[in-house]
Amino acid sequence: MKNVCLVTRIATVILIGFGGASVDAQDLPTTGSFETRIGRLELENGYPNAATVEKVFDDIDYQRACQAYLWALPLMAMQQWQNEHLTKFDAGKCDYVDYLTFQDKLGLLTANATTPYIMAFPNLKETGPLVFEIPAGPTAGGFTDFWQRPITDSGQTGPDKGAGGKYLILGPDDPDMKPEGYYVFRSPTVNIWSAHRALDPDAAKARALIAGLKIYPYSKRENPPATRHVSPSGRKWSGTQPRGLAYWEGLAKIINEEPVHERDRMVMGMLQPLGIEKGKPFTPTARQKKILDEAARTGELMARTIAYEKRFEGSSVWPGKHWDISLFLKETNQEAPHHTQFDERSSWFYEAVGVSTGMMGRTVGFGQLYLETAKDSEGNWLSGSQAYHLNVPKDAPVAQFWSVTVYDNETRCFVDTGVQPDRSSRDDIVKNADGSVDLYFGPSAPVGKPKSNWIQTLPGKGWFSYFRLYGPTQAYFDRSWVLPDIERVK
């Protein structure tokens, strides 16, 4: 119920916020007019006139749609990717798509360019309970529902702890079962995401790990069918949430496949006057289309602002620097003690996909950490037309490796220059005599600097960067190691 209370509170604030300042009921004229951010509103004998009624309802629906856009971001990322999986790659819902190169990952929100991804999007209503075989070895990942809430980690940060095993995932309405030899979990949603990374730096060993990932129905466990692995190579695709009316068309479709959870009931009620209702087709009127289209644009700008200008207390990593913790959720289920982390959730799921315990980077030497910046040392937005420099000090606090990646601030995918969009400590990069590394960013290679240390950007495009720590060590947690800001080269 705490989630319902939160949404109720948000809705109340929205609905009373027409004026620049708060307006009490007694301040409304019995007969007369007053200015608001949506124009002049008029009352006659305490009632809104016809023009005011129309304005108020339009604004109610518009404001609700903007907030619903933010609410739906994690769900719509999954729906979009599942659709691309089926239509662009000709993969079945129980097939894995293996994203091995940076070109394969060009449509993926804030992907890392270093390790292979292996992804599937099963529908448990269609298959019944599913078995997922995880091979022994260095893998990371797990399973989430379609709201991107973790069902369980697998691999090194999962219950198998890197030893491999069989995971049995039940759907929302499947009967309980606990067969011996399986890690058993239940998904709150019908559609799920099976997401894994092969972490072995040896390419042959990584391929063997990928081949060891299997999916099949529990009902066919005695004679399981072979798992198909599909390559996305050479196919253009996009995991970016749809824009405009397509966002709402996708939302209307997916909510008709999924159960409504308690925390979402209030938002579902807010969507009903906009023509989006479970159990009914989405046939919006011209008025609804206009409001939804505008709200999708404004909602995305809200998400972009929340993501790139983070105002979360404690998200800044080092005083005076512009590096923030990108995945700034207290818990993987997106809940804080007294509220759902609505803005933090919007920030992360606008930029990225997936949450797991391992991605929170809270255990010394294990998991990953995601540090982010969209600004240079002077606080200016990063521009693809400018040249920049970053010094990575020696002894980076990682048990495995670090990487720096550049992303397009509109698509949140790799800056698509046709060349590798990242550099990592695994690469053949030039180090300084003191062990530090100088990296360069810009539309052209820096004169007199090692090209191996340069990441290309696109003129006229904004970009942001993730600095990833794989297996963060104590020097990060005690902040004794400090990453400088990216500096513009003048």
Predicted feature descriptions by range:
Residues 8-19:
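Bacterial N-terminal signal peptides
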